[in-house]
Design a protein with these regions (language model features):
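Short beta-rich binding modules
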Residues: 1-192
């Protein structure tokens, strides 16, 4: 082998993995599916915003067993880095269900629907007693809306019976200072 000057150190040169955590994002798609029961599932896709550069995370690298661990400085402290590398990545959210006519005592089934879309800035009307009147959210209502999303790693079994993992949005939180993207800003991000 011919020696050269190039080196590679996984701790400093390795790629940055997707990390669980909370990130600023925007809704870029909404797909709904109605079931025979009358319930509808709302599936959103979120795109991590450029503002993620202001989010600090612990730098990770692959260890010898193929899992990730924190990169430590010379004092043994975890090294922080910007999450800017997450900007532009898209993640599916866990589906949000709307049950238009829940059985008596099962109105709780619509809590996640109300919370998720309220956290996106959707205002549902309330009567004088404070009871919320739900409405079916449409794509134009949510596209481009800002949120802080929590990414978690989920395990699943694929159709071949193999264990896999994927990152999904499991919580949608308000992003008070976030700005809604226009349809043009969302369309500019389409790669074709």
């Amino acid at each position: 082998m011919k020696p050269i000057e190039a080196t590679f150190d996984e701790a400093t040169d390795g790629s940055s993995p997707i990390m669980p955590g909370t990130y600023p994002a925007h809704v870029v798609t909404l797909v709904t599916r109605e079931f025979d029961s009358g319930s509808t599932v709302f599936n959103m896709t979120f795109k991590i915003a450029d503002d993620a550069k202001d989010t600090k995370i612990i730098k990770q690298h692959k260890n010898g067993s193929g899992t990730y661990e924190a990169v430590l400085d010379e004092k043994g402290q975890p090294i922080e880095m910007s999450a800017g590398y997450m900007s532009g990545k898209t993640f599916y959210a866990n589906g949000v269900w709307l049950t238009p006519e829940p059985e008596k005592g099962q109105g709780w089934k619509n809590r996640k629907y109300l919370e998720s879309f309220s956290n996106l800035g959707i205002d549902f009307p309330r009567n004088d007693d404070g009871v919320v009147s739900l409405a079916e959210v449409e794509e134009d209502d949510v596209l481009g809306r800002p949120a802080v999303v929590r990414l978690t790693e989920n395990e699943y079994t694929n159709r071949n019976g193999e264990q896999r993992t994927a990152f999904k949005v499991d919580s949608i939180l308000p992003w008070e200072s976030g700005k809604r993207l226009s349809a043009d800003e969302i369309a500019d991000d389409v790669p074709f």
